[in-house]
């Protein structure tokens, strides 16, 4: 799923820089607004 790929990118960038990517956060917010589950509600995080 596209959401999973975005989450993976955020995790990789967070590990590299200690910071989450603002662009990915915006894209993720847009997906959540379209009805995708928010990734922070997923139990496997």
Curated annotation (Swiss-Prot):
Bilayer topology: Single-pass type I membrane protein
A GO-annotated cellular component: host cell membrane
Residues the record lists as Phosphoserine modifications: 17, 21
Protein keywords: AIDS, Apoptosis, Host membrane, Host-virus interaction, Ion channel, Ion transport, Membrane, Phosphoprotein, Transmembrane, Transport
Region (Disordered): 1-45
Keyword flag Membrane: yes
Domain of life: Viruses
PTM (free text): Phosphorylated by host CK2. This phosphorylation is necessary for interaction with human BRCP and degradation of CD4.
Chief localisation class: host cell
Compositionally biased tracts (Basic and acidic residues): 1-16
Activity control note: Ion channel activity is inhibited by hexamethylene amiloride in vitro.
Subunit structure: Homopentamer. Interacts with host CD4 and BRTC; these interactions induce proteasomal degradation of CD4. Interacts with host BST2; this interaction leads to the degradation of host BST2. Interacts with host FBXW11. Interacts with host AP1M1; this interaction plays a role in the mistrafficking and subsequent degradation of host BST2. Interacts with host RANBP2; this interaction allows Vpu to down-regulate host BLM sumoylation.
Domain notes: The N-terminus and transmembrane domains are required for self-oligomerization and proper virion budding, whereas the cytoplasmic domain is required for CD4 degradation. The cytoplasmic domain is composed of 2 amphipathic alpha helix that form a U-shape.
Protein name as catalogued: Protein Vpu
Organism in which the protein naturally occurs: Human immunodeficiency virus type 1 group M subtype B (isolate NY5)
Gene (name only): vpu
């Amino acid at each position: 799923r596209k959401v999973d790929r975005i989450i993976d990118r955020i995790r990789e960038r967070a590990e590299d820089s200690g910071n989450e990517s603002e662009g990915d956060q915006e894209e993720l917010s847009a997906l959540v607004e379209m009805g995708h589950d928010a990734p922070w509600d997923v139990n496997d995080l």
